[in-house]
């Protein structure tokens, strides 16, 4: 029933106006799945290789389609993803491109679910599926690689951890985003938006902390449940090998100073989440920070782990971080992402399923977050390619009751 009979690929636009890969998978019984690959702006050194979309599509047509069609079953995700690895023949998808691989992997999952008449989260969930739903982390102020001439810290994230349900959490983040805009207007500070829809005012990091803290407090008072905030520091983008430190404009922080700075911000603002606070190669720095504040907050590895089982195991052995960001396109397939999630769970690491800065209307990650019982999902606050996932999360929560 789920034997794959056709795989088609095309270029479509992502949210930044750049081309990306979209895949369609059709099965013998008429099951159909469509998915599109996202793309990051701040990418980890160890991510799977993203090829030019036209090159990725041509390579996938030559190498992947013949291995899948009339041979592999969409209902068996591991079989699909093993075929993708075999077709590529490298350890980082440099032959067919992680962008073509992840699009096909996700499209096959949808086709398999379609045959069963089940939502994707049920098809993927298996033993992972719990009773809870992920808390959305909403990007409300941004800078770094997502918005030039703004904050050095890449993302300030609203976290409605006290929301009674998914819907209220989603709307709480939207309210914080709106309140940030109101406060900026009151203070006479102009602000455009960055890649992910967050406000990108020309203010210092210190001013941004105060701004987001005020906005979160105001909305928390209005809604009556706990809202905190967190950060994606994207510190690999701040770290300069030539100077051996983290560059904040005219200031350079050593690793020791960076750890101290992050610990102070966690204490001062009761941060619930800090992603990539140190360079992607600094397991020791992550371990030092985790030992110091890991009982107070989530220290999350994105560029540190790149959804890789091998890099996560290195982190586990070093006691570096206590949570992992999951981005399927970083590693190339849903199976690889599942394996990282399973290893994280075995060792008590929280999982955070995430979008990329260059996104499409694809909603697979909403299903992945629910299927794997992730603690958080990071997929923006506003803009259509972000709200597509958030609205799908609301629908899933309603369907699963």
Swiss-Prot record:
Organism the protein comes from: Haloquadratum walsbyi (strain DSM 16790 / HBSQ001)
Protein name, UniProt field: Enolase
SMART domains xrefs: Enolase_C (SM01192), Enolase_N (SM01193)
Catalytically driven reaction(s): (2R)-2-phosphoglycerate = phosphoenolpyruvate + H2O
Family to which the UniProt record says this protein belongs: Belongs to the enolase family.
InterPro entries linked: Enolase, Enolase-like_C_sf, Enolase-like_N, Enolase_C, Enolase_CS, Enolase_N
Keyword set includes Nucleotidyltransferase: no
Cofactor(s) recorded in Swiss-Prot or TrEMBL: Mg(2+)
């Amino acid at each position: 029933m789920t034997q794959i009979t056709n795989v088609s690929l095309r270029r479509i636009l992502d949210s930044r106006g750049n081309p990306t890969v979209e895949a369609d998978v059709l099965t013998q019984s008429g099951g159909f799945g469509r998915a599109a690959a996202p793309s990051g702006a701040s990418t980890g050194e160890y991510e799977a290789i993203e090829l030019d979309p036209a090159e990725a599509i041509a390579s996938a047509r030559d190498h992947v389609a013949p291995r899948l069609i009339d041979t592999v079953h969409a209902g068996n995700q591991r079989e699909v993803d093993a075929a993708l690895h075999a077709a590529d023949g490298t350890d980082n998808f440099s032959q067919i491109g992680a962008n073509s691989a992840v699009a096909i992997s996700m499209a096959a999952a949808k086709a398999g679910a379609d045959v069963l008449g089940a939502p994707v989260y049920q098809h993927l969930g298996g033993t992972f599926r719990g009773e809870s739903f992920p808390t959305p982390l909403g990007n409300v102020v941004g800078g770094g690689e997502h918005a030039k001439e703004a904050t050095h810290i890449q993302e300030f994230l609203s976290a409605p951890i006290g929301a009674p349900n998914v819907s209220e959490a989603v709307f709480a983040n939207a309210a914080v985003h709106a309140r940030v805009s109101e406060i900026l207007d009151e203070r006479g500070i102009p602000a455009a938006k960055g890649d992910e829809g967050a406000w990108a005012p020309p203010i210092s990091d210190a001013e941004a902390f105060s701004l987001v803290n005020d906005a979160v407090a105001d909305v928390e008072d209005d809604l009556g449940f706990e809202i905190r905030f967190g950060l994606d520091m994207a510190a690999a983008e701040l770290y300069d090998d030539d100077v051996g430190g983290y560059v904040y404009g005219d200031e350079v922080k050593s690793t020791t100073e960076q750890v101290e700075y992050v610990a102070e911000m966690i204490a001062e603002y009761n941060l619930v989440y800090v992603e990539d606070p140190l360079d992607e190669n600094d397991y020791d720095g992550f371990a030092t920070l985790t030992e110091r504040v890991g009982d107070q907050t989530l220290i999350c590895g994105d560029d540190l782990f790149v959804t890789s089982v091998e890099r996560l195991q290195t982190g586990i052995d070093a006691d570096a971080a206590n949570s992992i960001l999951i981005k399927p396109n970083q590693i190339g397939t849903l199976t690889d992402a599942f394996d990282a999630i399973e290893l994280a769970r075995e060792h008590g690491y929280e999982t955070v399923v995430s979008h990329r800065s260059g996104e499409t209307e694809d909603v697979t990650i909403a299903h992945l977050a629910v299927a794997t019982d992730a603690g958080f999902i990071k997929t923006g606050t506003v803009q259509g390619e972000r709200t597509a996932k958030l609205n799908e999360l609301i629908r899933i929560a309603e369907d699963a009751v």
